[in-house]
Amino acid sequence: MSQNREQLMEELSTNVFAMFRTLRNDIGKIFGGYIPWNEFIVLRILNRANKEMVSRVANELNVSNSHITAVTEKLINKGFVTRSRSTSDRRVVYLEITEQGKDLVAKMEGAKKQYLQERFSALSEDEMNIMISISKKLI
């Protein structure tokens, strides 16, 4: 491997990590006035599905059922989610987003969209497509 390639890989990895850190920190600040990121992700899934089993949410996020239970307990206490048990199988627990939760997701998605529009305004559509293509190769 050439020394130039090694330098390029080092610079690329540094830039990618810096980009992700910046995006994560900025989104965290934007969402800080609402709810934490992990709660938002669960709400977003429930907003899409409206009602979902705890196990399916956990599988989609690749986390344990107990983690989802802990996160949703906070969302329930805030009035964003309700929990119910299946009438046919008491082991099955469903989560459902409330109207208040739907409103919050809409506000947060709007704030995120505005941030991303500003953040990526320096890139053309072609440049964004190139970045998407490259990032898919690395994932």
Give, region by region, the residue ranges found by the protein language model:
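C-terminal regulatory/oligomerization modules of transcriptional regulators
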Residues: 1-7, 11, 125-139
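Charged, amphipathic alpha-helical coiled-coil/dimerization segments
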Residues: 74-129
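Short, locally clustered residues in the helix-turn-helix/winged-helix DNA-binding domain
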Residues: 44-48, 109, 136
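Canonical helix-turn-helix DNA-binding module
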Residues: 49-93
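N-terminal helix-turn-helix DNA-binding core of bacterial DNA-binding proteins
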Residues: 24-64
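N-terminal leader segment of winged-helix/HTH proteins
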Residues: 1-33
